[in-house]
Amino acid sequence: MQGDPDVLRLLNEQLTSELTAINQYFLHSKMQENWGFTELAERTRVESFDEMRHAEAITDRILLLDGLPNYQRIGSLRVGQTLREQFEADLAIEYEVMSRLKPGIIMCREKQDSTSAVLLEKIVADEEEHIDYLETQLALMGQLGEELYSAQCVSRPPS
């Protein structure tokens, strides 16, 4: 089934964002684990896997539309050296994604591609949850201070 070139371009742009997020979140997860924030690291790792599921769904859609998924392009990773920097970097990716997705959904509907629009709407719902989580963590960090916030995130060995 031949897809609209504009829809395919949008889907490949979104695929690039998902591939970038997978790598950034996974690296942040491993850094958090190394710093002793194992529960936080697990949450970040799960977010990386969520982005992988998005990439898979987008890839399937591009292939169905007789397009070629571009796995050779990836955006620059923003690697945070502190928890705050990591949350801010991850939030920046999410904001960029949302600025593309919402107009993209409208464009898909205008091009009579409701299936791609629904796929992107599902991704928006997931990204909104991640944005809420990241904004909450940054707000908590602001209220508690970075040291106290970080102390709350350290995993304690089982007793």
Swiss-Prot record:
InterPro entries: Bacterioferritin, Ferritin-like, Ferritin-like_diiron, Ferritin-like_SF, Ferritin_DPS_dom
Keyword Cytoplasm in annotation: yes
Cofactor note: Binds 1 heme b (iron(II)-protoporphyrin IX) group per dimer.
One example GO MF annotation: ferric iron binding
Reaction(s) this enzyme catalyzes, per UniProt: 4 Fe(2+) + O2 + 4 H(+) = 4 Fe(3+) + 2 H2O; Fe(2+)(in) = Fe(2+)(out)
Quaternary structure and partners: Homooligomer of 24 subunits, arranged as 12 dimers, that are packed together to form an approximately spherical molecule with a central cavity, in which large amounts of iron can be deposited.
Name of the protein in its database record: Bacterioferritin
Species whose genome carries this gene: Mycobacterium leprae (strain TN)
Gene name linked to the record: bfr
